[in-house]
Curated annotation (Swiss-Prot):
SUPFAM superfamilies: Glutamine synthetase/guanido kinase. This is Glutamate--cysteine ligase. GO terms for biological process: glutathione biosynthetic process. Pathway: Sulfur metabolism; glutathione biosynthesis; glutathione from L-cysteine and L-glutamate: step 1/2. GO terms for molecular function: ATP binding; glutamate-cysteine ligase activity; metal ion binding.
Length: 522
């Protein structure tokens, strides 16, 4: 691949700049439903929001209480955020007095056994989705599963792929070139993934009620107010061992060096038995506890801060879609919910992500080895637990480097891309970049820095602060204008999804045992 500066130079003509700008994006935002008291809502998914199994925009994640709002794919950032906002605005009008919890880490939790697993109805597909979640509960506990995040889906235009293909000296087909380039992006993203929790990590503190596992006492927490625990320099406890972790997966070593390596690694992981999970049992006294006793029940259980994706056809598994036609887009999974936005993410973050991901695509991306993977993991853990610590050092290619120095050089490259994306007389990308550049040498300008400063300055408990935000955003979204036509569209979508689920459940089907056997036979 050509050096970054040379490639940027070759993309500076009008047609290439237009090809660069035509990115496709989608957002998935998770949010817990809570009662006005702040306690987790324990009732069923609201019927006015349709079928969680069939609705394209409003579904549930792990729990019946954990809503997920999904946008279609957009090229225009304003349209993307407007769509996400409309879905929120419609939904809050149908929560029967409940609110949305506007941060990643849950708070007022009673017994973890009361957290309701999502229910998708009586069809075999619906039962399988529920059983998968039941397996997650047995494996990792319910608490970890109701931590929420924001996923950002991203792809570049066909025009850009054609231009990059033309500029390359590859012997690959265009489809192979696209997949290998996306895997190059993924490798560079993993090298730089710590940047996202540094800037956008928004879970440096949590309620003491979340700490029910003795192992979490190993963290040197400090206290604000009555029951807020925090680490002074943390950025994202969601991405630490307190959040999404799976020690069983630590030894999978799935390679991102090519699509073929990735698919081979995933196939082996899916079929790898786990002695630990076998102890849970698969079907005990006639009742299923998990889909199987492998390290991964299904591919979705594999935790990674980024995924290669392709829209599935029919009942294809994710790896089958990728094997059929290569990588279509990538999914960024390292974003905390932004508590300063009613919809969990703001436009300046989206523009930063565009620049960050284009940089990951356009930079040379050598293959990664085990020592670099260890370096990547250590850098990420250092930043999520103490990313705002003055003088923090990370490791790059075996050399010690300061976090701020590494960020300075990255922002220089991002600025080159921002200039290509901003038309004459426009500066949206450069303004967004300048906003986050303040955080390079001022950790208080990061989201986590703003949160800790706010909690300390106001001597307020994290839970009380979040509850105030929940109320504020509820009122804002409730007052957000919804036209009659938009309201009718959401009502029709909800009704159509319920009817679609009813039709599926009415169809003749094989037994659930046979359905599962058939699914895993393929």
């Amino acid at each position: 691949m050509k050096p970054f500066n040379e490639l940027v130079g070759k993309l500076s003509d009008a047609a290439s700049r237009q090809a660069l700008k035509s990115m496709h994006r989608g957002i998935e935002r998770e949010a817990l439903r809570i009662e006005k008291s702040g306690h987790l809502a324990l009732d069923k998914h609201p019927k006015a929001l349709g079928s969680a199994l069939m609705h394209s925009r409003i579904t549930t994640d792990y729990s019946e209480s954990l809503l997920e709002f999904i946008t279609p794919v957009f090229e225009d950032i304003d349209e993307l955020v407007e769509d996400l906002t409309l879905t929120h605005a419609y939904s809050v009008r149908h929560l029967n007095g409940q609110r949305l919890w506007p941060v990643s880490m849950p708070c007022y939790l009673g017994d973890a056994g009361d957290i309701p697993i999502a229910d998708y109805g009586s069809s075999n597909t619906g039962q399988m989705k529920r059983l998968y979640r039941k397996g997650l509960t047995y494996r990792y506990g319910a608490q970890m599963q109701i931590i929420s995040g924001v996923h950002f889906n991203f792809s570049v235009s066909d025009q850009l792929w054609n231009r990059l293909y033309e500029l390359s000296d590859t012997s690959l087909s265009l489809e192979e070139f696209i997949s290998e380039s996306y895997f190059g992006l993924i490798r560079n993203y993993r090298r730089l993934v710590w940047v996202l929790p540094y800037l956008f990590g928004a879970s440096p503190a949590l309620c003491s009620t979340f700490i029910q596992d003795p192992k979490t006492n190993e963290f040197p927490f400090e206290v604000i107010g009555n029951g807020t625990l925090y680490l002074p320099y943390a950025t994202s406890l969601r991405m630490s061992d307190l959040g999404y972790t799976n020690q069983e997966q630590d030894n999978l070593n799935i390679s991102y060096n090519s699509l073929a390596c990735y698919l081979e690694g995933m196939k082996s992981a899916i079929n790898m038995p786990s002695a630990k999970f076998a102890k849970i049992g698969v079907k005990v006294d006639g009742e299923y506890r998990q889909l199987n006793a492998n390290i991964l029940q299904i591919e979705n259980e594999f935790y990674s801060p980024i995924r290669a994706k392709r829209v599935a056809k029919g009942n294809e598994k994710p790896s089958e879609s990728l094997a059929r036609a290569g990588v279509e887009y990538i999914e960024v999974r390292a974003l905390d919910v932004n508590p300063y936005s009613a919809v969990g993410i703001e436009k300046s973050q989206i523009r930063f992500l565009d620049l960050f991901l284009l940089n990951c695509l356009l930079q040379p991306s050598p293959a990664s080895d085990a020592s670099e993977e260890a370096e990547i993991a250590a850098n990420l853990q250092a930043v999520v637990l103490e990313g705002r610590k003055p003088g923090l050092k990370l490791t790059r290619a075996g050399e010690e480097v300061s976090l701020s120095g590494w960020l300075e050089s990255l922002f220089g490259n991002l600025n080159d891309i921002a200039k290509l994306l901003d038309d004459e007389g426009q500066d949206d990308y450069q303004v967004a970049l300048a906003k986050w550049q303040k955080a390079v040498n001022d950790p208080d300008a990061t989201l986590s820095g703003q949160i800790i400063k706010g909690l300390k300055d106001n001597q307020i408990d994290h839970g009380d602060w979040v509850l105030q935000l929940a109320e504020q955003y509820h009122q804002e979204l409730k007052g957000y204008p919804l036209s009659e036509a938009v309201t009718m569209r959401y009502e029709q979508d909800a009704q159509a999804s319920l009817e679609k689920q009813a039709r599926l459940e009415a169809e003749p089907s094989v037994s659930f045992d046979d359905f599962l056997a058939d699914y895993f036979k393929a």
